[in-house]
Amino acid sequence: DRPYETAKADGIRCVSTLAALADTKPDVLVLCNPLKAMPQILGALKPLIDTDITTLTDVGSVKAMVREQVKAVGLEHCYVGAHPMAGNELSGWESSDPTLYDGALWAITVDENTEYQRFRAVATMIVDHCSNRLIVLDDATHDRCAALISHMPHVISTAMINELVANPNRNIAAALAAGSWRDMTRVALTD
């Protein structure tokens, strides 16, 4: 309840169910949930949203998988993939940073079935309403590039932490750690 109370205090309108959200008939609905929850959320949204009105997008870091999940529930005609290239190792409402997306680059992913007005709705949200920048890609190109510059650093960072924890001299190594260690392992703190 605390994140909702804080959000409400900050002037953000909160709803407690997907049905209540769908009742607001948003122009653009941005899914900001963990990727593993996507199939369940998409399945629950399908009978609730008016796809003639609402364009569906998400901020997931993997686009091809999400598009397949969107297709599996029959929402592909109203979907445009999006991935803001901004973030940090923190999570939760209390960790939010109002400047995190300032000037951020968003990858918008489309395919041959993406409707132009859907693309335009998401692009307008990103550029006009959020003052951000965008690049348009196909899902596969996005996923390969995101793996290289975002996912691989997470894997390497986690491997470094695991190596330290398993090392019998971990306390000495931790005492010697400085800026390079901090910078290389920061993203391992994500959940």
Q: Which residue ranges define each predicted feature?
A:
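Short acidic-hydrophobic, aromatic-tinged amphipathic segments that line or gate anion-handling sites
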Residues: 13-19, 135-137
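Rossmann-like NAD(P)-binding element
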Residues: 17-51, 55
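Short, structured coil segments at secondary-structure junctions
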Residues: 10-11, 75, 129-130
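Rossmann-like NAD(P)(H) cofactor-binding subdomain of soluble oxidoreductases
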Residues: 41-94
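Glycine-rich, N-terminal phosphate-binding loop of Rossmann-like dinucleotide-binding domains
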Residues: 32-34, 60, 110
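NAD(P)-binding Rossmann-fold cofactor-contacting core
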Residues: 1-10
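Internal alpha-helical scaffold of NAD(P)-dependent oxidoreductase catalytic cores
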Residues: 100-190
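Short secondary-structure boundary/capping segments
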Residues: 4-5, 21, 71-72, 96-99
